[in-house]
Amino acid sequence: RQSGAPLTHRPPWQFDASLGERKLRELLGVAHLGGYNAQDLVVAHGAAAALLSYAEHTQGRALAHVRGLTVQRSSELIDLPPATLRNLELIRTLRGEDSPTLLSLLDSCRTGMGSRMLRQWLVNPPRDRSVASARLGAIEQLLAQGEQPLREALRHVSDVQRIASRIALRQVRPRELAGLRETLATLPALLALLPVSDASDGLLAQAAAALTPDPAIHQLIAATLAPEP
């Protein structure tokens, strides 16, 4: 109510923990959730039941694109109540405006994906100092080599997270596929700009591994999509 977001009431049975656990197992194609370290999270199972039921209802189809599960425990994060977030003006001013806030001052991200990640980092800070140190270390490495070439390369990167979701839901538009095509073509240049070596094992090395392109996907999109859809 305070955020102004719409509120939708769901029936109590949709919060049933056993229903949520079954839905998660079916989505992930597993016999149990032990492999995700989520087998004993009864409250989370209930929340998942309602969330998945609501998403299936609004999308009008099964959520075939949900293929993974990441558990983030509250004990791993510093609890920032709404009043604290408001008083610190991390993401909203005391008047409820987007700027000036800590997020608005720090967010010079080139992509929507980066802005969303930065927001998550601010509102869900980790208790483990090594996590924050690793992030700062990666930022220092990037700044040390000069940020402008990387920012220029990121200018050609679309919001892949949202495009992937729209593809899975069969709602993607030709221009979004064109953006994905351009993003895939940009990946080699991005990889070349990351200061990593074969011996690297930090966050940038993880990013480099995740950004390794699949030429087959790029070739398929390039062959089937007009240059200017």
For each predicted feature, which ranges?
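Charged catalytic and DNA/RNA-contacting regions of genome-maintenance
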Residues: 1-141, 148, 155-168, 172-229
